[in-house]
């Protein structure tokens, strides 16, 4: 039976949350640089969910692309140890909302409240590495792995979240983004050349933090961060120094006094030998010598949980063709709408998700241009109509214009009548219009 949903508005920390009546009992759980996260109850399933509001996703091309990337990744990456996208919708205010499973807490909060017993430490590390094995097999680097991005429920099930900064496995990167405490040394030394090994380093830092209850490398700045890493690992080996491209970085590193490594058995005296061995293999200066997620899962330390028949890899590599695209906001908007329709299994007459990325861009660009022309024609018609009424209703005209400038369309995929680019870039798409006409909400079928 089809269920028609309606939007309602509420304020959370001064931020308007505009969601459908499918979701109730909103409570804030976290705030990030790009959005606010609230817990809620899915009234269809009676299950708790997390709703992440992406604020002003189309305010800039950079933010639009970032939102598009996160949605594409969430749709592609489906694994027990990764957060799962359950719903996505666009509000009349043009904000995008991701709905995912709700986990009880995150590892950062958990470590602040209590030390971890050995069995929990092992199980959490196992699940982190199990998730990373899958992510890396899909050709994806998380790039921002840290305790606050690791969610845990009351059953100790662990899920990695926040793929908004994830990138392709590419030897030429465009910058570094990971939180400093968990940042691999190659990012600081050769930030244009890194790969999936940066996630293994971050996981090693998290492993050590679970052991000690505090960050292993709490650097105050980049220089201090590198310094405290060398306090434990010693000076970087020649093979690593030879990869440094920046002349200033090379001068800095070679000017430092030589430091010998501290044996991990001495630094972590209360840790069992197999745990020390795995940690040491994860925190290696040279990324080429760092253990992989797959190999780490077979390490004796994780033997109680290792199951080679239940540690899957991705069915296909993630398609990163869009990653170097420099597109205008309107085109990203169309691409995003197409992805939302595809998630809801609603056909889009203008963009075929099975087409190549270039073909999708061409279709999206044409749709955006058609929308602009449609809006220009509408504005011209309104202008002509207003001119015809001039001299007839002088007093009423001012009121009419004021009302028209403030009136919002009832269609969430159509812009306002005050000259903005219309959001309905698929005006000829009957299915999309049917969705839009239901009080600014997609109609979702439930049996």
UniProtKB/Swiss-Prot annotation:
InterPro entries: Kinase-like_dom_sf (IPR011009), MAP_kinase (IPR050117), MAP_kinase_CS (IPR003527), MAPK_p38-like (IPR008352), MAPK_Sty1/Hog1 (IPR038783), Prot_kinase_dom (IPR000719), Protein_kinase_ATP_BS (IPR017441), Ser/Thr_kinase_AS (IPR008271)
Top-rank taxon, per record: Eukaryota
Keywords per UniProt: Activator, ATP-binding, Cytoplasm, Kinase, Nucleotide-binding, Nucleus, Phosphoprotein, Serine/threonine-protein kinase, Transcription, Transcription regulation, Transferase
Motif annotated as TXY, chain positions: 174-176
Activation/inhibition comment: Activated by tyrosine and threonine phosphorylation.
Assigned EC number: 2.7.11.24
GO biological process: cellular response to oxidative stress; osmosensory signaling pathway; stress-activated MAPK cascade
Domain Protein kinase: residue ranges: 23-302
Skewed-composition ranges (Low complexity): 373-389
Keyword ATP-binding set for record: yes
Annotated function: Proline-directed serine/threonine-protein kinase involved in a signal transduction pathway that is activated by changes in the osmolarity of the extracellular environment. Controls osmotic regulation of transcription of target genes.
Name of the protein this chain belongs to: Mitogen-activated protein kinase HOG1
The organism of origin for this protein: Eremothecium gossypii (strain ATCC 10895 / CBS 109.51 / FGSC 9923 / NRRL Y-1056) (Yeast)
Encoding gene (name): HOG1
């Amino acid at each position: 039976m089809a269920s028609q949903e309606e939007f309602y508005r509420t304020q959370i920390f001064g931020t308007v949350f505009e969601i459908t009546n499918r979701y109730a009992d909103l409570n804030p759980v976290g705030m990030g640089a790009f959005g606010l996260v609230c817990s809620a109850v899915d009234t269809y399933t009676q299950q708790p969910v997390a709703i992440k509001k992406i604020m002003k996703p189309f305010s800039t091309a950079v933010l639009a692309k970032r939102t598009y990337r996160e949605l594409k990744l969430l749709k592609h990456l489906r694994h027990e140890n990764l957060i799962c996208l359950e719903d996505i919708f666009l509000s009349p205010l043009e904000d995008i909302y991701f709905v995912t499973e709700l986990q009880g807490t995150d590892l950062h909060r958990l470590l602040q409240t209590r030390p971890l017993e050995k069995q929990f430490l092992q199980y959490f590390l196992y699940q982190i590495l199990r998730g990373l094995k899958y992510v890396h097999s899909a050709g994806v680097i998380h790039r921002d792995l840290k305790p606050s991005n690791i969610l845990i429920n009351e059953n100790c099930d662990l899920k990695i979240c926040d793929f908004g900064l994830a990138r392709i496995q590419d030897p030429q990167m465009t910058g570094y983004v990971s939180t400093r405490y968990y940042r691999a040394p190659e990012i600081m030394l050769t930030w244009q050349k890194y790969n999936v090994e940066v996630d293994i380093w971050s996981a090693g830092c998290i492993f050590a933090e679970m052991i000690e209850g505090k960050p292993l490398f709490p650097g105050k700045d980049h220089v201090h961060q590198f310094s405290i890493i060398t306090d434990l690992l010693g000076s970087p080996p020649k093979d690593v120094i030879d990869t440094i491209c920046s002349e200033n970085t090379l001068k800095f590193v070679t000017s430092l006094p030589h430091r010998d490594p501290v044996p991990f058995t001495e630094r972590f005296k209360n840790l069992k030998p197999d745990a020390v061995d795995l940690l040491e293999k994860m925190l290696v200066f040279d990324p080429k010598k760092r253990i992989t997620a797959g190999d780490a899962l077979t390490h004796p330390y994780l033997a109680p949980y290792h199951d080679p028949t239940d540690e899957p890899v991705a069915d296909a590599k993630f398609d990163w063709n869009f990653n170097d695209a420099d597109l205008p906001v309107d085109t990203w908007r169309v691409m995003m709408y197409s992805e939302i329709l595809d998630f809801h299994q609603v056909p889009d007459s203008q963009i075929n998700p099975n087409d190549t990325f270039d073909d999708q861009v061409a279709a999206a660009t044409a749709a955006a241009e058609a929308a602009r022309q449609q809006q220009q024609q509408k504005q011209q018609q309104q202008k002509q109509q207003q001119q015809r009424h001039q001299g007839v209703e002088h007093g009423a005209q001012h009121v009419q214009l004021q009302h028209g400038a403030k009136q919002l369309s009832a269609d969430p995929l159509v812009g306002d009548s005050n000259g903005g680019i219309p959001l309905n870039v698929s005006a000829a798409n009957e299915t999309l219009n049917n969705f839009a006409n239901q009080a600014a909400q997609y109609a979702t079928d439930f049996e």
